[in-house]
Protein backbone atom coordinates (compact mmCIF):
# COMPACT_ATOMS: atom_id res chain seq x y z
CA UNK A 1 0.00 0.00 0.00
CA UNK A 2 1.17 3.51 -0.80
CA UNK A 3 0.00 6.27 1.49
CA UNK A 4 -0.30 9.74 0.01
CA UNK A 5 1.98 12.23 1.80
CA UNK A 6 0.67 15.35 3.42
CA UNK A 7 -2.36 17.44 2.57
CA UNK A 8 -5.06 15.86 4.69
CA UNK A 9 -6.63 12.46 5.20
CA UNK A 10 -6.68 11.00 1.71
CA UNK A 11 -6.76 7.34 2.57
CA UNK A 12 -4.71 4.80 0.61
CA UNK A 13 -4.71 3.04 -2.74
CA UNK A 14 -2.98 -0.14 -3.78
CA UNK A 15 -0.75 0.79 -6.71
CA UNK A 16 -1.49 -2.40 -8.67
CA UNK A 17 -5.21 -1.81 -8.26
CA UNK A 18 -4.79 1.80 -9.30
CA UNK A 19 -2.87 0.83 -12.44
CA UNK A 20 -5.51 -1.72 -13.28
CA UNK A 21 -8.52 0.55 -12.75
CA UNK A 22 -6.98 3.55 -14.49
CA UNK A 23 -5.71 1.56 -17.43
CA UNK A 24 -2.13 2.67 -16.81
CA UNK A 25 -0.71 -0.84 -16.93
CA UNK A 26 -1.69 -1.14 -20.57
CA UNK A 27 0.25 2.03 -21.29
CA UNK A 28 3.37 0.56 -19.65
CA UNK A 29 3.51 3.16 -16.88
CA UNK A 30 4.82 1.23 -13.88
CA UNK A 31 6.92 2.47 -11.03
CA UNK A 32 9.87 0.35 -12.06
CA UNK A 33 9.58 1.19 -15.76
CA UNK A 34 11.56 3.70 -17.79
CA UNK A 35 10.87 7.41 -17.78
CA UNK A 36 7.93 8.48 -19.86
CA UNK A 37 8.89 8.68 -23.51
CA UNK A 38 6.61 11.65 -23.91
CA UNK A 39 8.60 13.49 -21.27
CA UNK A 40 12.01 13.07 -22.92
CA UNK A 41 13.52 16.03 -24.73
CA UNK A 42 16.90 16.63 -26.28
CA UNK A 43 17.94 19.71 -24.36
CA UNK A 44 21.49 20.37 -23.11
CA UNK A 45 22.98 18.64 -20.08
CA UNK A 46 22.75 20.16 -16.60
CA UNK A 47 25.49 20.71 -14.07
CA UNK A 48 26.01 17.66 -11.85
CA UNK A 49 26.54 19.94 -8.85
CA UNK A 50 22.83 20.80 -8.63
CA UNK A 51 20.11 18.51 -7.30
CA UNK A 52 18.39 16.50 -9.99
CA UNK A 53 15.03 16.51 -8.28
CA UNK A 54 11.94 18.59 -8.94
CA UNK A 55 9.20 19.65 -6.54
CA UNK A 56 5.67 20.39 -7.71
CA UNK A 57 3.28 22.10 -5.30
CA UNK A 58 -0.44 21.35 -5.55
CA UNK A 59 -2.99 23.43 -3.64
CA UNK A 60 -6.72 22.72 -3.62
CA UNK A 61 -9.64 23.01 -1.17
CA UNK A 62 -10.00 19.73 0.74
CA UNK A 63 -11.94 21.17 3.66
CA UNK A 64 -14.28 24.12 4.13
CA UNK A 65 -17.19 25.27 1.93
CA UNK A 66 -15.50 24.19 -1.32
CA UNK A 67 -14.32 20.79 -0.04
CA UNK A 68 -16.25 18.89 -2.72
CA UNK A 69 -13.73 20.17 -5.27
CA UNK A 70 -11.03 18.21 -3.45
CA UNK A 71 -12.97 14.96 -3.21
CA UNK A 72 -11.12 13.32 -6.11
CA UNK A 73 -7.67 14.70 -5.25
CA UNK A 74 -6.33 11.48 -3.74
CA UNK A 75 -7.10 9.51 -6.87
CA UNK A 76 -5.66 12.08 -9.28
CA UNK A 77 -2.56 12.62 -7.16
CA UNK A 78 -1.88 8.89 -7.09
CA UNK A 79 -2.26 8.71 -10.88
CA UNK A 80 0.22 11.55 -11.25
CA UNK A 81 2.68 10.12 -8.72
CA UNK A 82 2.54 6.73 -10.43
CA UNK A 83 3.10 8.22 -13.88
CA UNK A 84 5.99 10.32 -12.57
CA UNK A 85 7.42 7.54 -10.43
CA UNK A 86 10.43 7.02 -12.68
CA UNK A 87 11.06 10.75 -12.94
CA UNK A 88 11.22 13.10 -15.91
CA UNK A 89 14.05 12.84 -18.39
CA UNK A 90 15.32 16.15 -19.74
CA UNK A 91 18.39 16.44 -21.93
CA UNK A 92 19.65 13.02 -20.91
CA UNK A 93 19.28 13.79 -17.20
CA UNK A 94 16.60 12.14 -15.08
CA UNK A 95 14.94 14.26 -12.39
CA UNK A 96 13.02 12.62 -9.59
CA UNK A 97 9.69 14.36 -9.05
CA UNK A 98 8.03 15.01 -5.70
CA UNK A 99 4.45 16.29 -5.52
CA UNK A 100 3.70 18.29 -2.36
CA UNK A 101 -0.07 18.56 -1.96
CA UNK A 102 -1.68 21.00 0.45
CA UNK A 103 -5.19 21.90 1.60
CA UNK A 104 -6.12 25.56 1.08
CA UNK A 105 -9.13 25.01 3.41
CA UNK A 106 -11.37 27.07 1.06
CA UNK A 107 -9.86 30.15 2.67
CA UNK A 108 -7.84 32.88 0.89
CA UNK A 109 -5.55 33.56 3.84
CA UNK A 110 -4.75 29.91 4.41
CA UNK A 111 -4.27 29.29 0.70
CA UNK A 112 -1.77 32.15 0.58
CA UNK A 113 0.00 30.77 3.65
CA UNK A 114 0.44 27.24 2.28
CA UNK A 115 1.56 28.66 -1.06
CA UNK A 116 4.21 30.79 0.62
CA UNK A 117 5.34 27.81 2.69
CA UNK A 118 5.70 25.73 -0.46
CA UNK A 119 7.65 28.54 -2.12
CA UNK A 120 9.91 29.55 0.76
CA UNK A 121 10.33 26.40 2.84
CA UNK A 122 9.90 23.62 0.29
CA UNK A 123 11.27 25.64 -2.64
CA UNK A 124 8.95 24.16 -5.24
CA UNK A 125 9.95 24.45 -8.88
CA UNK A 126 6.37 24.67 -10.15
CA UNK A 127 3.02 25.34 -8.48
CA UNK A 128 -0.38 23.96 -9.42
CA UNK A 129 -3.65 25.30 -7.98
CA UNK A 130 -7.29 24.51 -8.55
CA UNK A 131 -10.88 25.26 -7.63
CA UNK A 132 -12.48 28.60 -6.76
CA UNK A 133 -10.98 32.06 -6.61
CA UNK A 134 -10.70 31.79 -2.83
CA UNK A 135 -8.00 29.15 -3.32
CA UNK A 136 -6.50 29.84 -6.73
CA UNK A 137 -6.10 33.62 -6.74
CA UNK A 138 -4.02 33.95 -3.55
CA UNK A 139 -1.81 31.04 -4.63
CA UNK A 140 -1.29 32.67 -8.02
CA UNK A 141 -0.51 36.02 -6.39
CA UNK A 142 2.08 34.43 -4.11
CA UNK A 143 3.75 32.75 -7.08
CA UNK A 144 3.77 35.91 -9.19
CA UNK A 145 5.37 37.86 -6.36
CA UNK A 146 8.02 35.19 -5.76
CA UNK A 147 8.78 34.46 -9.40
CA UNK A 148 7.58 30.85 -9.25
CA UNK A 149 5.80 29.45 -12.32
CA UNK A 150 2.20 28.49 -11.61
CA UNK A 151 -0.57 26.83 -13.60
CA UNK A 152 -4.13 26.98 -12.27
CA UNK A 153 -7.67 26.04 -13.23
CA UNK A 154 -11.38 25.92 -12.24
CA UNK A 155 -11.96 29.61 -11.67
CA UNK A 156 -13.73 31.54 -14.45
CA UNK A 157 -10.80 33.13 -16.21
CA UNK A 158 -12.17 36.66 -15.83
CA UNK A 159 -12.33 36.18 -12.06
CA UNK A 160 -8.72 34.97 -12.08
CA UNK A 161 -7.36 37.59 -14.49
CA UNK A 162 -9.28 40.74 -13.57
CA UNK A 163 -9.73 39.71 -9.94
CA UNK A 164 -5.95 39.78 -9.57
CA UNK A 165 -5.51 43.20 -11.15
CA UNK A 166 -5.31 42.41 -14.85
CA UNK A 167 -6.79 45.07 -17.14
CA UNK A 168 -8.89 44.47 -20.27
CA UNK A 169 -6.35 46.31 -22.40
CA UNK A 170 -3.46 44.17 -21.12
CA UNK A 171 -2.57 41.27 -23.39
CA UNK A 172 -0.29 39.77 -20.72
CA UNK A 173 -0.77 40.95 -17.15
CA UNK A 174 1.41 38.33 -15.46
CA UNK A 175 4.87 36.86 -16.00
CA UNK A 176 4.83 33.64 -13.96
CA UNK A 177 1.17 32.70 -13.55
CA UNK A 178 -0.98 30.98 -16.19
CA UNK A 179 -4.51 29.65 -16.19
CA UNK A 180 -6.90 27.46 -18.15
CA UNK A 181 -10.63 27.58 -17.55
CA UNK A 182 -13.97 28.51 -19.03
CA UNK A 183 -15.07 32.11 -19.00
CA UNK A 184 -18.16 34.22 -19.39
CA UNK A 185 -18.36 33.60 -23.14
CA UNK A 186 -18.58 29.86 -22.52
CA UNK A 187 -21.29 30.32 -19.87
CA UNK A 188 -23.18 32.60 -22.23
CA UNK A 189 -22.97 30.03 -25.02
CA UNK A 190 -24.11 27.24 -22.72
CA UNK A 191 -27.02 29.16 -21.23
CA UNK A 192 -28.32 30.60 -24.50
CA UNK A 193 -28.25 27.15 -26.11
CA UNK A 194 -29.64 25.33 -23.06
CA UNK A 195 -32.46 27.60 -21.88
CA UNK A 196 -34.35 27.80 -25.21
CA UNK A 197 -34.91 24.04 -24.96
CA UNK A 198 -37.67 24.91 -22.45
CA UNK A 199 -40.46 27.42 -23.17
CA UNK A 200 -40.06 30.41 -20.78
CA UNK A 201 -40.83 34.12 -20.55
CA UNK A 202 -37.06 34.80 -20.80
CA UNK A 203 -37.03 36.58 -17.42
CA UNK A 204 -33.96 35.55 -15.39
CA UNK A 205 -33.64 36.06 -11.65
CA UNK A 206 -29.97 36.11 -10.72
CA UNK A 207 -28.31 35.57 -7.34
CA UNK A 208 -24.69 36.67 -7.70
CA UNK A 209 -22.53 37.10 -4.58
CA UNK A 210 -20.27 39.97 -3.62
CA UNK A 211 -17.04 38.13 -4.36
CA UNK A 212 -14.57 38.06 -7.24
CA UNK A 213 -16.56 35.49 -9.20
CA UNK A 214 -19.94 37.10 -8.59
CA UNK A 215 -18.71 40.56 -9.46
CA UNK A 216 -17.02 39.36 -12.66
CA UNK A 217 -20.20 37.54 -13.70
CA UNK A 218 -22.36 40.59 -12.92
CA UNK A 219 -20.20 42.89 -15.03
CA UNK A 220 -19.92 40.56 -18.01
CA UNK A 221 -22.57 37.83 -18.19
CA UNK A 222 -25.46 40.10 -17.22
CA UNK A 223 -25.03 42.45 -20.22
CA UNK A 224 -24.53 39.49 -22.58
CA UNK A 225 -27.80 37.90 -21.44
CA UNK A 226 -29.60 41.21 -21.90
CA UNK A 227 -28.15 41.53 -25.40
CA UNK A 228 -29.44 38.03 -26.14
CA UNK A 229 -32.99 39.06 -25.31
CA UNK A 230 -33.28 38.04 -21.66
CA UNK A 231 -34.59 40.34 -18.94
CA UNK A 232 -32.21 40.09 -15.99
CA UNK A 233 -33.68 40.66 -12.52
CA UNK A 234 -30.76 41.35 -10.16
CA UNK A 235 -31.65 42.14 -6.52
CA UNK A 236 -28.01 43.06 -5.89
CA UNK A 237 -24.89 41.44 -4.51
CA UNK A 238 -25.21 39.47 -1.29
CA UNK A 239 -22.60 38.45 1.26
CA UNK A 240 -21.38 34.86 1.41
CA UNK A 241 -22.96 33.18 4.41
CA UNK A 242 -26.29 35.01 4.17
CA UNK A 243 -28.99 32.95 5.89
CA UNK A 244 -32.18 34.76 4.85
CA UNK A 245 -33.03 35.19 1.16
CA UNK A 246 -36.66 36.21 1.61
CA UNK A 247 -36.23 39.60 -0.08
CA UNK A 248 -34.55 38.11 -3.15
CA UNK A 249 -37.16 35.36 -3.42
CA UNK A 250 -39.98 37.91 -3.19
CA UNK A 251 -38.36 39.91 -5.99
CA UNK A 252 -38.10 36.88 -8.26
CA UNK A 253 -41.71 35.89 -7.60
CA UNK A 254 -42.98 39.41 -8.25
CA UNK A 255 -41.04 39.58 -11.52
CA UNK A 256 -42.31 36.12 -12.56
CA UNK A 257 -38.80 34.85 -13.29
CA UNK A 258 -39.14 31.55 -15.15
CA UNK A 259 -35.36 31.15 -15.06
CA UNK A 260 -33.11 31.33 -12.03
CA UNK A 261 -29.30 31.57 -12.31
CA UNK A 262 -26.70 31.66 -9.56
CA UNK A 263 -22.96 31.38 -8.75
CA UNK A 264 -22.91 30.76 -4.96
CA UNK A 265 -20.87 28.67 -2.59
CA UNK A 266 -22.68 25.35 -1.98
CA UNK A 267 -23.96 26.09 1.52
CA UNK A 268 -25.51 29.39 0.40
CA UNK A 269 -27.32 27.74 -2.49
CA UNK A 270 -28.69 25.01 -0.24
CA UNK A 271 -30.09 27.67 2.10
CA UNK A 272 -31.55 29.72 -0.73
CA UNK A 273 -33.08 26.82 -2.64
CA UNK A 274 -34.81 25.34 0.40
CA UNK A 275 -36.23 28.77 1.29
CA UNK A 276 -37.31 29.34 -2.32
CA UNK A 277 -39.29 26.10 -2.42
CA UNK A 278 -40.81 26.80 1.00
CA UNK A 279 -41.83 30.32 -0.08
CA UNK A 280 -43.38 29.20 -3.35
CA UNK A 281 -40.79 30.19 -5.92
CA UNK A 282 -40.76 27.46 -8.57
CA UNK A 283 -38.86 28.50 -11.72
CA UNK A 284 -38.98 26.37 -14.84
CA UNK A 285 -35.18 26.35 -14.99
CA UNK A 286 -32.81 26.59 -12.02
CA UNK A 287 -29.30 27.08 -13.38
CA UNK A 288 -26.42 26.53 -10.98
CA UNK A 289 -22.71 27.18 -11.30
CA UNK A 290 -19.90 26.95 -8.74
CA UNK A 291 -22.33 24.77 -6.80
CA UNK A 292 -24.32 21.85 -8.16
CA UNK A 293 -21.11 20.63 -9.78
CA UNK A 294 -20.72 17.42 -7.76
CA UNK A 295 -23.14 14.58 -7.05
CA UNK A 296 -22.72 14.96 -3.29
CA UNK A 297 -23.84 18.60 -3.44
CA UNK A 298 -27.02 17.77 -5.33
CA UNK A 299 -27.82 14.60 -3.41
CA UNK A 300 -27.66 16.56 -0.14
CA UNK A 301 -30.68 18.58 -1.31
CA UNK A 302 -32.87 15.51 -1.56
CA UNK A 303 -35.80 15.57 -3.97
CA UNK A 304 -35.47 19.31 -4.67
CA UNK A 305 -32.07 18.69 -6.26
CA UNK A 306 -33.46 16.56 -9.08
CA UNK A 307 -33.82 18.59 -12.28
CA UNK A 308 -31.34 21.33 -11.44
CA UNK A 309 -29.52 22.58 -14.53
CA UNK A 310 -25.76 22.71 -14.36
CA UNK A 311 -22.68 23.29 -16.42
CA UNK A 312 -19.90 20.78 -17.00
CA UNK A 313 -16.25 21.62 -17.54
CA UNK A 314 -15.48 17.90 -17.88
CA UNK A 315 -17.34 14.60 -17.97
CA UNK A 316 -16.28 11.07 -18.96
CA UNK A 317 -17.98 11.77 -22.32
CA UNK A 318 -15.18 14.17 -23.30
CA UNK A 319 -13.28 12.45 -26.16
CA UNK A 320 -9.83 13.41 -24.85
CA UNK A 321 -6.90 11.66 -23.17
CA UNK A 322 -4.26 12.63 -20.61
CA UNK A 323 -0.87 13.01 -22.33
CA UNK A 324 0.96 12.16 -19.09
CA UNK A 325 -0.92 9.01 -18.07
CA UNK A 326 -2.47 8.00 -21.42
CA UNK A 327 -5.78 7.55 -19.58
CA UNK A 328 -8.89 8.47 -21.59
CA UNK A 329 -11.68 10.54 -20.07
CA UNK A 330 -13.99 7.55 -19.97
CA UNK A 331 -11.37 5.42 -18.27
CA UNK A 332 -10.63 8.23 -15.83
CA UNK A 333 -14.25 8.30 -14.70
CA UNK A 334 -14.63 4.51 -14.64
CA UNK A 335 -11.34 4.02 -12.82
CA UNK A 336 -12.29 6.51 -10.12
CA UNK A 337 -15.62 4.77 -9.53
CA UNK A 338 -13.98 1.32 -9.39
CA UNK A 339 -11.23 2.45 -7.03
CA UNK A 340 -13.33 4.53 -4.65
CA UNK A 341 -16.91 3.34 -4.95
CA UNK A 342 -17.89 6.97 -5.49
CA UNK A 343 -19.52 8.51 -8.54
CA UNK A 344 -17.27 10.32 -11.02
CA UNK A 345 -17.10 14.08 -10.66
CA UNK A 346 -16.07 16.94 -12.91
CA UNK A 347 -12.89 17.77 -11.03
CA UNK A 348 -11.14 14.62 -12.22
CA UNK A 349 -10.51 16.07 -15.69
CA UNK A 350 -8.98 19.47 -14.93
CA UNK A 351 -7.01 18.22 -11.93
CA UNK A 352 -5.28 15.60 -14.07
CA UNK A 353 -4.87 18.20 -16.83
CA UNK A 354 -2.76 20.28 -14.43
CA UNK A 355 -0.22 17.46 -14.28
CA UNK A 356 -0.29 17.03 -18.06
CA UNK A 357 0.60 20.70 -18.38
CA UNK A 358 3.20 20.50 -15.61
CA UNK A 359 5.06 17.59 -17.20
CA UNK A 360 4.95 19.25 -20.61
CA UNK A 361 6.28 22.55 -19.25
CA UNK A 362 9.11 21.01 -17.22
CA UNK A 363 10.29 18.96 -20.19
CA UNK A 364 10.03 21.82 -22.69
CA UNK A 365 13.16 23.56 -21.34
CA UNK A 366 16.82 22.63 -21.04
CA UNK A 367 16.81 23.38 -17.31
CA UNK A 368 13.56 22.53 -15.49
CA UNK A 369 14.84 24.35 -12.38
CA UNK A 370 15.09 27.63 -14.29
CA UNK A 371 11.85 29.23 -13.16
CA UNK A 372 11.88 31.97 -15.79
CA UNK A 373 12.45 29.45 -18.57
CA UNK A 374 9.62 27.23 -17.31
CA UNK A 375 7.27 30.23 -17.15
CA UNK A 376 8.17 31.15 -20.71
CA UNK A 377 7.58 27.55 -21.78
CA UNK A 378 4.07 27.63 -20.30
CA UNK A 379 3.31 30.77 -22.32
CA UNK A 380 3.71 28.78 -25.55
CA UNK A 381 2.63 25.35 -24.29
CA UNK A 382 0.52 23.05 -26.48
CA UNK A 383 -0.58 19.94 -24.58
CA UNK A 384 -3.28 17.26 -24.75
CA UNK A 385 -5.37 16.81 -21.59
CA UNK A 386 -8.70 15.26 -20.52
CA UNK A 387 -10.40 18.67 -20.92
CA UNK A 388 -9.06 19.04 -24.45
CA UNK A 389 -6.03 20.57 -26.10
CA UNK A 390 -4.53 23.47 -24.14
CA UNK A 391 -2.70 26.02 -26.29
CA UNK A 392 -1.45 29.17 -24.61
CA UNK A 393 -1.05 32.08 -26.99
CA UNK A 394 -4.43 31.55 -28.67
CA UNK A 395 -6.67 32.57 -25.77
CA UNK A 396 -8.34 35.79 -24.68
CA UNK A 397 -4.91 36.94 -23.46
CA UNK A 398 -1.41 35.49 -23.18
CA UNK A 399 -1.97 34.16 -19.65
CA UNK A 400 -5.21 32.28 -20.31
CA UNK A 401 -6.58 29.35 -22.28
CA UNK A 402 -10.40 29.43 -22.42
CA UNK A 403 -11.79 25.90 -22.09
CA UNK A 404 -15.32 24.61 -22.77
CA UNK A 405 -18.23 24.48 -20.41
CA UNK A 406 -21.33 22.60 -21.51
CA UNK A 407 -24.91 22.75 -20.27
CA UNK A 408 -26.67 19.79 -18.71
CA UNK A 409 -29.09 18.63 -16.04
CA UNK A 410 -29.20 16.44 -12.96
CA UNK A 411 -31.65 13.57 -13.48
CA UNK A 412 -32.74 10.62 -11.40
CA UNK A 413 -30.62 7.66 -12.44
CA UNK A 414 -32.02 4.74 -14.37
CA UNK A 415 -33.18 1.69 -12.45
CA UNK A 416 -30.29 -0.50 -11.39
CA UNK A 417 -27.75 2.31 -11.18
CA UNK A 418 -25.36 2.35 -8.23
CA UNK A 419 -25.93 6.09 -7.83
CA UNK A 420 -29.17 8.05 -7.28
CA UNK A 421 -28.44 10.88 -9.74
CA UNK A 422 -26.79 11.27 -13.11
CA UNK A 423 -25.59 14.41 -14.88
CA UNK A 424 -26.54 14.40 -18.56
CA UNK A 425 -25.26 16.80 -21.22
CA UNK A 426 -27.93 18.75 -23.08
CA UNK A 427 -25.84 21.09 -25.26
CA UNK A 428 -22.29 21.30 -26.59
CA UNK A 429 -21.96 24.78 -28.10
CA UNK A 430 -18.46 25.32 -26.68
CA UNK A 431 -17.14 21.97 -27.93
CA UNK A 432 -19.16 20.12 -30.60
CA UNK A 433 -16.79 17.14 -30.31
CA UNK A 434 -18.45 16.19 -27.01
CA UNK A 435 -21.65 14.17 -27.55
CA UNK A 436 -25.01 15.42 -26.25
CA UNK A 437 -27.24 12.91 -24.43
CA UNK A 438 -30.67 14.57 -24.23
CA UNK A 439 -32.60 17.86 -24.01
CA UNK A 440 -33.30 20.01 -20.96
CA UNK A 441 -36.53 19.25 -19.12
CA UNK A 442 -38.47 21.90 -17.13
CA UNK A 443 -38.61 21.74 -13.35
CA UNK A 444 -42.36 22.33 -13.48
Regions found by a protein language model. Give the residues of each.
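Short, charged, surface-exposed loops that flank catalytic or proteolytic processing sites
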Residues: 363-376
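Solvent-exposed, acidic/polar segments of extracytosolic/periplasmic ligand-binding ectodomains
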Residues: 382-444
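Beta-alpha junction/loop-to-helix N-cap segments that form part of ligand/metal-binding clefts
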Residues: 41-49, 68-73, 87-166, 238-245, ...
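Extracytoplasmic ligand/sensor domains, especially the bilobed periplasmic-binding protein
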Residues: 124-235, 285-310
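Extracytoplasmic "Venus flytrap"
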Residues: 57-80, 102-109, 131-132, 207-216, ...
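C-terminal segment of N-terminal export signals and the immediately downstream linker at the start
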Residues: 34-59
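N-terminal secretory signal peptides
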Residues: 1-17, 26-33
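Extracellular/periplasmic periplasmic-binding protein-like sensory domains
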Residues: 276-352, 364, 422, 426-443
Amino acid sequence: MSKLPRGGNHGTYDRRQLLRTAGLAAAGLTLSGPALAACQVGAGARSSTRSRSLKIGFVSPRTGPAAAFGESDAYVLELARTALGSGLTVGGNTYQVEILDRDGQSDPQHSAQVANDLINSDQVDLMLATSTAETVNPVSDACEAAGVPCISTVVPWESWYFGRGGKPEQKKAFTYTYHFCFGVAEFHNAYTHLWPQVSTNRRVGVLWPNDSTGNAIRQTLGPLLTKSGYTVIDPGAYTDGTNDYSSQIARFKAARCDIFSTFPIPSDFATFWRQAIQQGYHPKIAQTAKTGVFPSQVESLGAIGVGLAGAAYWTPAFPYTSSLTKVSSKRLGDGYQEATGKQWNQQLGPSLALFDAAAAALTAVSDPQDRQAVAQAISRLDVETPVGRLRWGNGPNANVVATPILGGQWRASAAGSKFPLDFVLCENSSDPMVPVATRLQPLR
